[in-house]
Amino acid sequence: MIQATIRRSHDKGILSFEMTGHANFAEHGQDLVCAGVTAVVFGAVNAVIVLAGFEPLLDIGEDGGYFYFEFPESLDPEARQKAQLLIEGMIVSLETIERDYKDNLRVTTNII
């Protein structure tokens, strides 16, 4: 199962998100859940880089079972606002996938 964990603060919105695990919906190379989650996450992160104009802190696992995104501490408020909206859109898409594939994807939010 892919576990998506979103970290939020009370006042700054999304701080980071982490993806761990594998969907195990189908064999490697044919796993539609994995492909969907990957497309949503990479699309959102690429949109943040291009449209919000900054490089987030990223850690991408070598075997494909790990992805970490974090907003930098010092970030222009306008860039943060754009990126927050893009990542919120990513979360909505992940939750939509989760609705149909509960055994393969779990999205949780931690407020700190």
From Swiss-Prot:
Signal peptide: none annotated. Its EC number is 3.4.22.-. GO terms for molecular function: cysteine-type peptidase activity. The keyword S-adenosyl-L-methionine does not apply. The keyword Hydrolase applies. CDD domains: Prp-like. The active site is at residues 22, 34. GO terms for biological process: proteolysis; ribosome biogenesis. Keywords: Hydrolase, Protease, Ribosome biogenesis, Thiol protease. InterPro entries: Peptidase_Prp (IPR007422), Peptidase_Prp_sf (IPR036764). Pfam families: Peptidase_Prp. It comes from the Bacteria. It is an enzyme of class 3 (hydrolase). Homodimer. Belongs to the Prp family. NCBIfam families: PRK14553.1-6 (NF011126). An essential cysteine protease that cleaves the N-terminus from ribosomal protein bL27. PANTHER family: HYPOTHETICAL RIBOSOME-ASSOCIATED PROTEIN, RIBOSOMAL-PROCESSING CYSTEINE PROTEASE PRP. This is Ribosomal processing cysteine protease Prp. It comes from Bacillus subtilis (strain 168).
